[in-house]
Amino acid sequence: RLMQGKIGSIVAIEPATGEILCMVSSPSYDPRLMVGRDRGKNHKMLSKDPRKPLLNRAISGQYPPGSTFKPTQALTFLQEGLITAGTQFPCHHGFRYGRFFQRCHGHASPISLIPALATSCNAYFSQGFFRMMSARRRYGNVQNAMTRWKDYMVSMGYGYALGTDLPGERR
């Protein structure tokens, strides 16, 4: 019922073992439509549905990681010595870089790491990423900084299939 009328997926995983406890994809369809004389017609109807009920979004959908990415960023910036737990960045309802603006919600400013994680401050982690990309003495150039950042992301499992036995799993 939680996903009724919504598009997306929910997966609950046991952190200690990686066991999948629950997996839901929405919208779904009545599996009885795929049996009987009308299954071909029903499949065609479902495949043309713009909401894509045949797509199992839990294993085949590709989504930006959103706020789940922030602890990963924090670990990267800490490991690289770019921030400490006490490092503060301003947040004026977001982060601006040229014409790009990453919005954030209202909270105290400036903000340090723990409150930034607790409030999911977009500006804090954008500032950290900007600091990493701008550290030319440390990395030489932006490309080297980006490669180093990507190495951290790969080491933490981002960008790759989980390797489950589920059909249709995508990177």
Q: Which residues does each predicted region cover?
A:
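Short loop/turn motifs at secondary-structure junctions and domain boundaries
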Residues: L2-K6
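Beta-lactam-recognizing serine transpeptidase/beta-lactamase-like catalytic domain environment
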Residues: G8, A12-T68, T72-R171
